[in-house]
Every structure is written in C-alpha cells, then in structure tokens.
Amino acid sequence: MATPDDPATPALSLSASNSSSPTAASSVPPPTGTSEIQYDDVAIIGMSCRTAGGNDSPEKLWRFIMDKKDASGESPSWRWEPWVRRDTRNAKVIEKTISKGYFIEDLENFDASFFGISPKEAEQMDPHQRLGLEVTWEALEDAGINPQSLSGSDTAVYVGVDSDDYSRLLLEDIPNIEAWMGIGTTAHGIPNRISYHLDLMGPSAAVDAACASSMVAVHTGRQAILAGESRIAIVGGVNVCLSPALFHMLGAAGALSPDGVCLSFDEEARGYARGEGAAILILKKMSHAIMDGDHILATIKGSAIAQDGKTNGIMAPNAKAQELVARKALKQAGINALTVGYIEAHATSTPLGDPTEVSAISAVYGVGRPTDTPALIGSIKPNVGHLEAAAGAISLVKAVMAVQKGIVPPQTRLNKLNTRVDWAKSGLHVVRESTQWGTEDSPRRAAICSYGYGGTVSHAIIEQFAHAADPFTASTSDDNHPTLLLLSAPQGKQRLPAQSAALAEWISPAGAHESLRSIAATLATRRAHHENRAAFIVSSHTEAAETLNLFSKGAEHDSIVQSRTLDNNINKQIVWVFSGHGSHWSGMGKQLLQNAVFYRTVAPLDIVVVQELGYSAIEALKTGRFESSGQVQVLTYMTQIGLIQLLKAKGVHPHAVIGHSVGEIAASVAAGCLTPEEGMIIVTRRARLFAKVIGCGGMFLVSLPFAEVLAELGGRTDIVAAIDSSPSSCVISGLNAPLEEYVEKLKNRGIRVFQVKTDIAFHSPMLEVLSKPLKESLEGSLNPQPPNIKLYSTSQADTRHPARRDAEYWVDNMVKPVWLRPAVTAAIEDHYRIFMEVSTHPIVSHSLDETLAENGASDFTTIHTMKKEQSAEKCILHAVAQLWTKGVKIDFKFLGRQWSREVPKIRWSHKRFWKEVSTGSASAQTVHDPDKNNMLGQRMVVAGTNMTIFTTALDESSKPFPMPHQLHGTDIIPVSVYVNTFIKATGGKVLSKMELRVPLAVTNDVRNVQVIVDGQSVKVASRLSSSDDMSWVTHSTASWENEPSANVLPSLDVSSVIKRIGTRVSETFSVDYLKKTGVSGMAFPWAVNDHYNNTKEMLVTLDNDPEHETMSWDPCSWGATLDAATSVGATLFSREVKLRIVSHIDRLTIYSSDPPPKRYHLYVTEASSSQVHACSADISVLDLSGTLLARIESIRFTEVEATPTKSTSIESGVHQIAWVPARLSEKPLSLEQIVLVSEDDAKLEQYANELQRQAPKIVKLTSAAKLRDNGALFMREKNATVIYCPGTVTSLEDVASASHRFIWEVATAIKFLVENSISAKFFVILDRTFLAGSPTALAQGALYGLARVVASEHSDIWGGLIDNEGPLFPVMPLKYVQDQDITRYIDGVPRVARMRPFTKQQRYAPSTARTLLPKPEGTYVLTGGLGALGLETCDFLIEKGARRIVVISRRDIPARSQWSKASENLAPILERVKAMEKTGASIYFVSLDIGAADAHQQLLFALERLSLPPVLGVIHASGVLEDSLLVDTTSDSFARVLSPKISGALALHKAFPPGTLDFFVLYSSIGQLVGTSGQSSYAAGNSFLDVLAAHRRSQGDNAIAFQWTAWRGLGMATSTDFLTLELQSKGITDVGRDEAFQAWEHMSKYDVDQAVVTRTLALEADDILPCALLEEVVVRKARAQDQSAPASGNASDSSGRPTASADLKPWLDVKIRECVALVMGVEDIEEIDTRVPLSDYGVDSIMTIALRQKLQSKLKIKVPQTLMWNYPTVSAMVGWFQKQFEEGQ
C-alpha cells in the first residue's frame, strides 16, 4: 500500500527565546563570500527608524537617500509657544533664534493604548520615550522576534539620549507637576520603559555622550553580548528638539547652520542643522542568530569608544583621537583598513569639524590606497539632519543598508567640495551619485564614525553577511495547501481591519515572491499575539488577498475566524472530548488518508483490524462503505487515533480528556492509559461480539433530562436511559418494539426525538450477554497504565474515579449508562472552559454548550475538529484557528522555519498626546507682588474713558497673603486683601457699600484677574486663564472717595473702655472660637496680647507677625491689620457657634497717612443697624495711645450655607460607635452544608448539636489547615457555610499568641475558599468579645478589624462576624442578618455598628478629677515617638505642660554628643527634639522593641535607671504598616504588623496595670472600622487596641483608644492623592494636626473607652451611602428645587435604568465605559475594549478609587473596594452590576 510523501517538517524552533541544540549551528555551511564565519561576532538582526521626511522604516529611509531628498524645514510654531508665553522677555529672543532644522511631523502623536498607557500618563511622557517604545517594537518585528517572547529574559537595552526639552517644559511648570511626570520626563525612562513594557530583566540604561550617545549605546550593547550578560541587546538613540533654548545656545556658539540645513563636505558648510529621529537596532551573537534562524543584516566586527583628552577647547574636535579610536576598532575586528570600502562620516557641516574628521579618516582609510580605488565616504546628515544623540545609530542604519544592497548612495546637498581638504591626496572620494559596490574576494565592509562635542569619540566596523542557502526552506509543494495567516492587536478589535488591509495590499502582488507558508510562519512565530485575534484559512496569495480585504471591510466568511481571547483569569487548557457512535459519514477518511501524519498513525492499526476482523479498515475508509455498527465503531476509533496525532502535529495538545461511549477508548489512548494497538483490540473484539445482537435494538436522543426519563421508566429493562447527554437531553436504548412504542408516546406529548444511527441497543441490559465473552477475550491483552493527563470517566457515576482501564472497565463501558453531563460538569468545576470534540462530525458539541451554560460558565468555547462533507484539512486548521483566537497556546512549528522580513509590520493607531502647560507661574508674568497683599498687576488706562484696569494672574504661587485661608478646604482671598487692593488701586481713603459676592478661590489653576476702577466705583473680577470662552465673575464691588469727612471721632480712652467692659478673657478666645466654627487658620500671622469682652463690646490688643521684630510683608499694607479686625470682629457674636464670612461693609475709612503699626488695639461694638442684620459690627483700629487709625462701619457677617458637615466644631469631629438593631432579610440564608471549624472541642460539639436541625450535613474540623487540605473533597454544595469559632484563652500571657493564631485561622480559611473558587459564606462566631471582660475577649478582639477588611475584600464570601452574648448558637443573625460585616447579638436582638455623636450624659461629673492631659510633675511614656505622629504627640504633651517624656523606639539613638553626626534620616528628628527641649521639657530615649516577649520588664528596668518621677500617662502610638490583600499575606507579615500593636500594647498593659496612671491612650485607626482594603493585619492590630481600652476601663482605668482618620500630611500614609481619594470613597476626610489634638482635649471630658476622630463629607441627596457606619451622621445636600424638570445631562443616570433584563446589559456597558473614559481622559468610549483589563489601559490605584466613586455616583449602587481587582474588565463589571440590579440590591 502506497504511503503519501512526507511534507517538509520544520527542524528547529522558531521562537527567538528558544534556542535549538548547540550542534545546529555547526550543521549550517558558512556564508558565501567570506573566508570564515566568526561565530563570536555580534550580528545586527533587525532595525527600525523614524526621521523627518516621513521615514518610518529603513527601506523608506533608503529610498529617501537614494533620491537625494532632504527633510529640512521650519520647527512647528506651536512647539515654541509655551516658552514664548512663559516669560515676556522670551518672545524677542525666540524671534531671532534659528528655527529651521529637520523635524518629525506629528511628533505629538503616540499609540498609547497599544502599550496599555493611559491618556493621562501618555501626555506626561517625553516624546523620546514614546518614540523609543514604538521604534523598538518595530525593530523587534524586523528581527523576527516576538516581543512577548522576551519576557523575563536578560535582554539589554541601551539608548542614547542627551536632551530633556519636554522635561523642562513640564517640570518648570511647578504648580502643575503631577506624579507620572517623574518617570515620564527622565532620560533613564527611555530604556527603562522599554524594559518595563517588554518585561526585560537585563541591563537597562540611558547613555549620554552628546552626539556620540547612540554609538556608545551600540558599543555597550555589543559588549554586554560578548560578555555573556545578555543574549539580545536593543540599542540605538532618540532625539527630539522641542525647546528654543538649545537652538539659541547653539546658534550663539556658531554651531548651527543659519539656513537650517546640513552641507556635509561642502565648501559652504556653516554649521549643522538639528534633526529629530530615532534608530533602534537589535543585536545578537552570530552563533545564536544562525541557530535561531534569524536574518542577519550585517555583523559588527569591531567597535571602540574613547575620549579626545584636553584639546584647544572641550568642544573642539581632535583628529588624532578620531584616528586612534578608528585604529582601535580595526584592531579589535582583525581587519585591514584597506578592505573597508565605505566610511559613514560624522560630518557635522561645521567649518572646523569636517576638515578635521576627513583628515582622520584619510589617515586611517585613505593613505596607501591605489588612486583608482579610493575609499568612499558620505554622511546622512544632509538628508535627515544631525540627530545628535541618535546620530550614530541612524548612520549605522544607513551603512547596514548600503552593505546589504551593495550600493553606496549619493551625497545630498553637495555642490562644491570643501577646499580645506586636499581630496587628491586623501585617498577618499565623496560619492555624488549612487555607486555599485561589489567585491569579489572579500565581503563588503563599512566604518561608522560618531563623535560628541564633549570629546567622546566612537567608531564601529560592520561587515556584509552573505546568506547561505537555508537548509530548512519549506517545500514548494506546500504552496497549494491551506495554511493559517494570523493577525492580532491589543486594546480593541478596531485595529485588526487596518492590519488586514495592509497585509492584503502587500501580499498580492508585492509579497507574491514569498511563499504563503513563510508568511504564515512569520505572523505565527515571529510576531506578538495580542488579545484581539483574527485567523484566515487560505490556500493561495490571491485567496489570501481577497479574504483579508473582505475582513478589512467588515464582511464575514467561512475562512475567517475572529475572537478576543478568553479573559486572563480563565483557564485556557483544552479538554478533548471523543464522541461516540454517530459521527461517521462515508467520506470521512478519504482526505485524512492523504495526510502523511494521519496515514503513518493508522497504518499499524489496520494490521490489527485485518488480524482480528479479516478486512482492511483503511480500505473501508477509502470506499466509504460501513456495513455494521461494529465496523462503524472500528472506523470511528481509527479516525480518532489519527486525529490525535494530526492535532498534535498542528501544535494542539490536550490537558484533559473525556470519552463518550466508544470514544472512551480513544480518550484512554490520548491519556496514555492504553496503546493505540490495545485500543484497537478492544474495539475489534467488541465488534466481533456485536454480531450476536445486531438488529435487535436501537437508540434515540430524547429532549428530556436523564433523571426525568430514568424516573419515568422506573425499573424497566427493555428500555433504559442510556446516556446522560446534557441538562435537557438524554439517549434511551432498548429493544426495537418497546422502544418504538415509547418513542411514539413521547412524540404525541410534543417531545422531540431523534434516532441514533445504530442497530444495537448500546448501554443497555441487552448487551449483558456479551459481558463475560468480552472480559475473557480482553484479559491478558491489555496492560493499562495510569493516565498522564486528567482523564474523566463516563462509565462511572463518579466521573473523577481513577478506575483502571482494564477488561472489566470496558465491559462497564459497553453495558452501563454513559455519564457525559456529569463528566463535563466535573471538568467545569475543575475550571476547564475550552472543549474540543475530536470526531469526524460534531455530535456532542451542543450537549457541551448546554452543560457549560447550565453550570454558569459565561466565558467558554466548544470546538469541533471536522464536519461532514467539508475539507478535513481546512476544518482542522479552522479548529486550530478557533483555539488560537480564544487564547490557547499553539505550537506553530508545523508552519516551518522559513520566514520573511517583508511582511508588513505593526500599524500604529496614533492620537495626539501633549501636555498643555500653563503660561508659567503667575508671579513670572510681571503681575502683582504677593508681599504687597493686593492684586494689582499691570496697569492700563482705557483711552477716552475714566477707566483704569489692573490685570494680573492668580494662582497658588502668587497668593497675596502668607498663610492658608480656607473655606471648605480651598484657599480664598480674604476680605482684607480686597480692601487693601481697592485702597491701593484708587488712592482713596474711604470705601463704601462694599459687597463681597463670590469667593475668589486660589488654586493651582491660573485665574486672570482684573481690578477695574471706573469713576468712583471699583471691582474685582476673574476667570480661568485656560477658558477664554468663560464669562468673567465679579467677586467684590465698592464705591470710593479720596479723603474722609472732617467728622473724625476723638481718640478712645482705652483704660476707661477696659474698666467698663470688665471681663478679661483668654488671649486665644478669638482663635478658639473660630476653630470651633471650622476656621482652621488666619490669612496673616497675628496674635492677641489682651482681650476684654462682654456681649456688646470688645477691646483687643494685637501684634502683627509676633515672631519677628518687623513684619515680613510690605509695611504699607493694611492686609494683616484688617484681617485681624474682620476675624476678631466676628467673635463678638460667639453666643452661637456658626461659621460666618463677611458679606458687606457699609463704610471703611483709613484716617492715618502712615503705615499701620505692628501693635495696635481693636475696639468692636455691635453696629447700630444690627436690628436689621443681627450680626453686624463697627470696628475701630487704634494705636496703643488710643488714636483712631481706621474704622469699619457696619461690617456684616453672614452664615455660610451648605457647610460640608453638620458643623465644623470639634464636637462634629468625634464620634462614638453605637449598636443599633439590624435590618433583617426576608429571605433566610440557605444552609445546605455547614463546616464548623474550632480548636475548642466542647464548643464544636455544642454548636454541631444545636445546628443539626438547620442543615442536613455538618462537617466538624479542628483547624482551618484541615479545611485547606481536605475541604475540596467534601465542599461541593453551592450553598456551603463555613463557621469559625476561636477557642478559649485563660491567661493574659497567652493572649498575643492566641490572637495571632485566631487571625491566621481566618486568613487560611478565606485563602482556601478564594483560591478554590468555592461558593460559600464564611462566618466567625465570637463570645462576648466587645464586652472585653476576659483574656478570651482580648485575644478575639483583633478579629473585629480583620472581619471588616475581609468583608471589603471578599464581600461575596463574607457572611459576617457575630459577637454572641448569649449561651446558644446565634442562628437568627446567621440566617437573617445579611450584608453586614459585624453583628452583636444582645438579648436576642442582632445589632450593627453606627457612628453617633457623644452625649452629655457620657461626660464626667464636674467634680471628677480624671483627665487626658499631662501634669508638670509627672513622667509620660510614648511609644512610636520618633514617627511623624509620635513627634507631634510629644510636642502636644509639652504644649500642655509635660516636662518629662520617655520615648520608646526600636531605633538606636546615639549619645547626645554624637547628634551632630546623626544620619540623614535621623538628623531632622533630633533637631525637632532639641527644639522641643528648648521649652524647658526633657526627652529621654529608650531603645526597645516594645513587641518583644520581655518588653515590659525591659521597660520598667529602663525607667528605674532613669530615676524619674512616677509615670502618670502612657501613649501607645507605635505601629507598622504592610499593605497587602489578605490572599497575598503571610503569617510572617501578620506577625510583623501585630507585634507592636498587640504584643506592644500588652507589654504596656502589664507594666502599668489599670488604675496606676492618669491616662492610658492607644492610637487606633478608622481604617479598621470602614474596612480599608489591603490593611487586614493593621486593622486586626488596631481593633485589638479598642478592646484593650475597653478592658482597662472596665477595671476602672482612664483608658481610651482614638480611632484616628488620616492626619493631614503626617503618619504612615501621608495625604497623597491616593489617600485623599480613598478617604473620600468612604465618605470621610483627614484631619489636621491641631484638629486631632483638639479632639484629644475634648475627649478628656468624657467617660468613654473609644473615640472615632474624623469628619464626614456631604453627600448629594440621592448618593449611595459609601459606608454603613456613617448612616446616622452623614449630611445630605438639599435636592434641587425643581424635581419635575426633565432629566438633563446632570440628572441621575440611574433613573433611566432599563427594567427589562435584556436591555440592562447594554445600558450598563455604556454607563460603565463612560465612567472609565472619564477617569482615563478618553474622549470616545468605543476606544475602551470591554474585555481588556483596565490595568492594561494604565488605570492605576488612584484612578481605581476615582472610578469606584464615579460608578457609585452614576449607578447609585454601593461599589466594593475590590470590584476592579475581582472584576478587572468592563465586561466583568457589567456582569457584577447586572447581578446586583437583578437581585434588587
């Protein structure tokens, strides 16, 4: 029997990252034209470039050079505009600056989404980095290296760069600097970004050697390869010219061409022209390149770098140094200079540079040559300019092209050779026209020169690589066979059509000379494989072009397979499913037999068939005549075995297998249990026995579930349910007559029935007669082995049962039911989602789809290998294509080794990304002087009018007052600055009818401000400078007069007023009152020295800028004095604590012509008009003798509306935790299986007994480790409930270790449930923990904080923590309290935590002596005292009277004599300590790990040695923060965080027992109350502190735990954007240092053990409550008055939510993408691929919080912190929100 010819088979791997055996290289003959290959040479295997003139590839650049084109032109004017606007002096200079050069068009464009970079980050990236990324990707594709294959490799990246224009543009705009600008604007960011995005682990460095940078980078990369540091090196350079600064400098130095062109070697050369561009080359050792099948463009024979030493000037060229570095490179290469035919010169076109360089080149390469064969020289610079840092690399690209093509291109812009060079004697010739470059006896060689103006000289020698015949060339016979062309793209499928069109355009006719197979191999093995994929099954170039064009136009075709890969978190391993009887058709084997792999596989099996049955199965396949069911099964098995090998030959391998009926035999072969021959023995011997039962029975597919049919048939044996096919169908089997009768009944009931093509009742009792003969015939013929991959049984009810595939198994397979649905379900439960039916026609694929859908698998695929009457070859390729487009890894070696560099490369999808900087800091624009405390900038008189306008720009850099003056967190211009502005603008002394309309905010955004004096009126107006179309806002208006009326009030008798008022109040009275109203600070520094006050009048003595002898601002300014007047004046109305601001002044008069004094009096009385406006005052400013200096009449203070919280007083910033009755769910939790975990045997038994009536199945375990190790075996129920009950602790000594153990038990259980995707609810049951009455309660206390974080990170798993205060198991809260993190079960009532204000009833009685404040006579112990919060606490204690503080720290503090030598980190801390000690306090240090086992003893010993007065107070502020999600934590990381919190607190508890101190203060955190994700360990430690405080107070101690919010700018998590957003997402804010200590003092009045210190944010009327804890304290803004108005763009989006389920998903898709686009800064939501993880778009942690807030606001549903972690794509989030809405949450 003839065997088909074997097709060519690839011999080597095509992956660039996979090396073949070392012997492969030696089998390749040396290239022709060389005497010998130096395998240690470094090969250039790929390159790409970008230059002016639209040259975006080496080929385009070559044509450009050959055509003598040049790309010189003007710099785009918009680039220099920011510098023009930055300083008024710049414009004239820039006008005279040379602006011509060689510029890349559309430099601002970048394909950010391709690299997963967000628009916001992209605009903060230097174009150097953008060019570097794109050109590197192009170069790797040119090299035939899949960039993704380099991940984790030692690939080196060296990139030359020496300009930072974009960095200066962004970073000199200081107020607008953002986080990403750091890495985005650095030089090292260029190579580092390449390494980062490609996940490279080799060296990565920027090289700056001026204009030699890129050649130094090439040399360094070559050295890295030769040294064995890196297998591949990415080298080159990038240059961008954005700023006029360097143009101006170079022009001034005479280095630049006035005409903006390079005239290398020309007599008229007068300087160089700057050029933009990038060139990247890919290097690899020659031996590796040959082994890997790379195309070698040239070899680098030698390279050298040096410095030219001390010359006439550091920038002067040195011919001797240039000569020496060339000779060094030649020596290294072992090459005679006379064999180098072409030199690519540096040739900068400078009068000195060109002659100097030519003399050096002549000395090396020209001298000694025959006059008729001079060395040829040229330079690329007249074509594309001097690319400076990239100059050497672009020259190298040109030289490589010349060496490859055998042509020396012509020199551009050469009219007359430079006469300073003696060309006749030089041995050199400048090529004016393109010249053929042929050599007979040696390869073409070229030299490249590159020099830096700082003195760096570099040189390289390259050599032609003449390609040998490829021994692995694919057979031309393959050209008519179908093959696969693969295209892929990241971030949205919209890229694919453009790629397809480009490939179609090239493939015919341009690509016709390339074999279709080599094109396919290029795309499959040497290009990246992204998420969006399309595969094309084609047989010719013409068909390929047509199919690709169809796809590019959006058409569908059978030859096109398109899909996005399955999500990253989905298992992409394949399950092969071998179907059983019924897939056969007459022509199924005819084409398959033409395939050599198939034929070789089945030929040995045909021998077995002939021996066993007496006929040839191969002949039967050829004829297509199948005479019996037995023969069908033989041929079915044979084709399946052939398909196994055929699929493997196509690079497809299974990871699990399932067999259906007779398909189980082939499945067992695929799994390695049987040999193919053993399988055929089973099939043939069964077939022989089937002759006894043929024709007696049959089978039908029925559209009813298996269980239903089984019940309906009862115990019948004549008809049975034979195959459990899918959730809605099964196959019945039986004797013909009763089967037909039953089927007829089913049809009459309207049930669909289909006959199976068989005359045997398989899987029925009818075949039991064959059982014994079959078993006997197989015994001794089989040697079954264990499977080598996952194998599911369909012959066993337990489909995972590892039954041996022996004779008895195959009897069961023949007689017993087929459990296909359970087997597929088991595979689904084991996370398989890709199923391939291995058969000649699909018969179970529908059942697979149905079972997958039934099991909730939303992202899956089923694929079949062949289909009836269709080309087998194309069907199999179609299946391979389907697998690949779903993300399955396919080994494409079958496509061969040959590949093509000409296949079109990446098509970029460019968009503009450019950071629009402000016009510069406002203070740089000849604007107002902030120290004069006014807003008067440039003055302009409007012609023909009585109007004068002062214009200025206002931002934080030009704030006209020295200190923060905030309203609702934003600085606003104080009234005193308006007054000072009006006085100075008009020159008047009187202002009247002054209105304060709208606050003028001072922010980073520059505002244009106008002060307009129009006749006798004056006003201030502003608008944002970036919004020219925005209308002007008027902030304040007034009328003015020149001089006051003659009616001057007499001097005030100050002593008489003081006597009349009588009452003297604290100097801090005014400041304290203003703080209560929420005013955190004054606009100017002033202090009250004396304050006399009653309800009608005040006399106050003040000092401006009290810490200085003279004031630190313009002495003529009334700003500070009037700020004090308006601030202190407001306190006349202190009867009610309300925030008020000045809204109106009737009249303000300045009487004095002298500057205001530093010290002065204020006299304040109620205004006579106060009956109309209750809060109006008259204020007089007097000097110390009582003389009137200024007077404000009827200044009106108006209450501020819509303050962000109920009140800004300190009372509103402290809260208690109250426990309110929980809302009960109408639907109880379903308890199908309960797993009890506890180390307490007695509790385990008690709870198990009490729960017996609640759940049918209860499992008891003594540890979470046992759950982890064995849980997967018994936790199969969908509604499992895991309950953890920590044990009992009897001794205080065991509390710390038990606490850690309890925490880790919970962590272990949660990790197990998450990692195994088990659907369960997890509960923790505590025993009176909140009451804190025992060591058990203390040890369990840490679980409170842990519970809230787990609830946040894993809300789908978390059932709740129930703190049970009753004797029985808390069944009721377990079942009916849902979606709560913690529940206390008290007297049969479940209660949950809510924040509430403290009540007066909680205060101490007035006679109580307890306090939280220090006394001078005591000693105070402070842990964590050297941290940010600790130092502030130390300062506060000293402020309040402490004189001795002992600071406990793990740091070793040097002796005071050594403090001057302290480390950089420690020195500022010690300086702070010294400053505090200057107040008279003493600070002592004890170096101690407070978490150590014997810490309390060490502490007491240390205190004893210090011999200080008794310790009266302890503050425990120590802590360690290690943020990590619970599933990523380790026991050790928990221990590090818990040690200072739990062990440290216990050490202090032991050292200072309850009742021995005045106070015991613990620093806890609000993070554990609101469930801050990532802080499970920190939260656990802090909640322990809460319980310890309660424990001590229950024993009579004055202990309190402060549950602090973040302290603004302080602590372990300073107030960054991330922290601010995180707090806002919880509905809370940070507090300032002073607010925190005000809270401390305030709580000194209360008899409580805990205090939550935070402020809440105001919510919109319909906003979702961000945290249930805030339910009773949050303030909601009033609804808009017109609720009946039609919804506008600002109306609630959720109001339009569709009610129909079908419409909800697309609606959610749009809404979520709108939110994502808003956060990312993307204009078109279509740019957001719903299947791409948001992290791939560059969404970082800050954006994640912002997105969560946007989603919560738009969709009006609470969004968990972990949503974007657990549901990382838009598609996944749509599913989550849809579920929430449909469940009515």
Curated annotation (Swiss-Prot):
<dbReference type="InterPro" id="IPR016039">
    <property type="entry name" value="Thiolase-like"/>
</dbReference>
<dbReference type="GO" id="GO:0006633">
    <property type="term" value="P:fatty acid biosynthetic process"/>
</dbReference>
<dbReference type="InterPro" id="IPR032821">
    <property type="entry name" value="PKS_assoc"/>
</dbReference>
<keyword id="KW-0596">Phosphopantetheine</keyword>
<feature type="domain" description="Carrier">
    <location>
        <begin position="1706"/>
        <end position="1781"/>
    </location>
</feature>
<dbReference type="Pfam" id="PF00109">
    <property type="entry name" value="ketoacyl-synt"/>
</dbReference>
<dbReference type="GO" id="GO:0031177">
    <property type="term" value="F:phosphopantetheine binding"/>
</dbReference>
<dbReference type="InterPro" id="IPR020841">
    <property type="entry name" value="PKS_Beta-ketoAc_synthase_dom"/>
</dbReference>
<keyword id="KW-0597">Phosphoprotein</keyword>
<keyword id="KW-0012">Acyltransferase</keyword>
<dbReference type="GO" id="GO:0016491">
    <property type="term" value="F:oxidoreductase activity"/>
</dbReference>
<keyword id="KW-0808">Transferase</keyword>
<keyword id="KW-0560">Oxidoreductase</keyword>
<dbReference type="InterPro" id="IPR036736">
    <property type="entry name" value="ACP-like_sf"/>
</dbReference>
<feature type="active site" description="For beta-ketoacyl synthase activity">
    <location>
        <position position="386"/>
    </location>
</feature>
<dbReference type="GO" id="GO:0044550">
    <property type="term" value="P:secondary metabolite biosynthetic process"/>
</dbReference>
<dbReference type="Pfam" id="PF08659">
    <property type="entry name" value="KR"/>
</dbReference>
<comment type="pathway">
    <text>Secondary metabolite biosynthesis.</text>
</comment>
<dbReference type="InterPro" id="IPR049900">
    <property type="entry name" value="PKS_mFAS_DH"/>
</dbReference>
<feature type="active site" description="Proton donor; for dehydratase activity">
    <location>
        <position position="1123"/>
    </location>
</feature>
<dbReference type="InterPro" id="IPR009081">
    <property type="entry name" value="PP-bd_ACP"/>
</dbReference>
<dbReference type="InterPro" id="IPR016035">
    <property type="entry name" value="Acyl_Trfase/lysoPLipase"/>
</dbReference>
<dbReference type="InterPro" id="IPR014043">
    <property type="entry name" value="Acyl_transferase_dom"/>
</dbReference>
<protein>
    <recommendedName>
        <fullName>Mellein synthase</fullName>
        <ecNumber>2.3.1.-</ecNumber>
    </recommendedName>
</protein>
<feature type="domain" description="Ketosynthase family 3 (KS3)">
    <location>
        <begin position="39"/>
        <end position="464"/>
    </location>
</feature>
<dbReference type="Pfam" id="PF00698">
    <property type="entry name" value="Acyl_transf_1"/>
</dbReference>
<dbReference type="InterPro" id="IPR001227">
    <property type="entry name" value="Ac_transferase_dom_sf"/>
</dbReference>
<feature type="compositionally biased region" description="Low complexity">
    <location>
        <begin position="8"/>
        <end position="27"/>
    </location>
</feature>
<dbReference type="Pfam" id="PF02801">
    <property type="entry name" value="Ketoacyl-synt_C"/>
</dbReference>
<dbReference type="InterPro" id="IPR042104">
    <property type="entry name" value="PKS_dehydratase_sf"/>
</dbReference>
<feature type="active site" description="Proton acceptor; for dehydratase activity">
    <location>
        <position position="965"/>
    </location>
</feature>
<dbReference type="InterPro" id="IPR014030">
    <property type="entry name" value="Ketoacyl_synth_N"/>
</dbReference>
<dbReference type="InterPro" id="IPR018201">
    <property type="entry name" value="Ketoacyl_synth_AS"/>
</dbReference>
<keyword id="KW-0521">NADP</keyword>
<dbReference type="InterPro" id="IPR006162">
    <property type="entry name" value="Ppantetheine_attach_site"/>
</dbReference>
<comment type="function">
    <text>Polyketide synthase that produces (R)-mellein, a secondary metabolite that inhibits the germination of wheat (Triticum aestivum) and barrel medic (Medicago truncatula) seeds. Condensates 1 acetate starter unit and 4 extender malonate units. The nascent pentaketide intermediate then undergoes an aldol cyclization and is aromatized via dehydration. The (R)-O-methylmellein isolated from P.nodorum is most likely to be derived from (R)-mellein via an additional methylation at the hydroxyl group. Interestingly, no O-methyltransferase gene is encoded in the vicinity of MLNS on the chromosome.</text>
</comment>
<feature type="active site" description="For malonyltransferase activity">
    <location>
        <position position="661"/>
    </location>
</feature>
<dbReference type="GO" id="GO:0004312">
    <property type="term" value="F:fatty acid synthase activity"/>
</dbReference>
<dbReference type="Pfam" id="PF16197">
    <property type="entry name" value="KAsynt_C_assoc"/>
</dbReference>
<feature type="region of interest" description="Ketoreductase (KR) domain">
    <location>
        <begin position="1418"/>
        <end position="1608"/>
    </location>
</feature>
<dbReference type="InterPro" id="IPR013968">
    <property type="entry name" value="PKS_KR"/>
</dbReference>
<feature type="active site" description="For beta-ketoacyl synthase activity">
    <location>
        <position position="346"/>
    </location>
</feature>
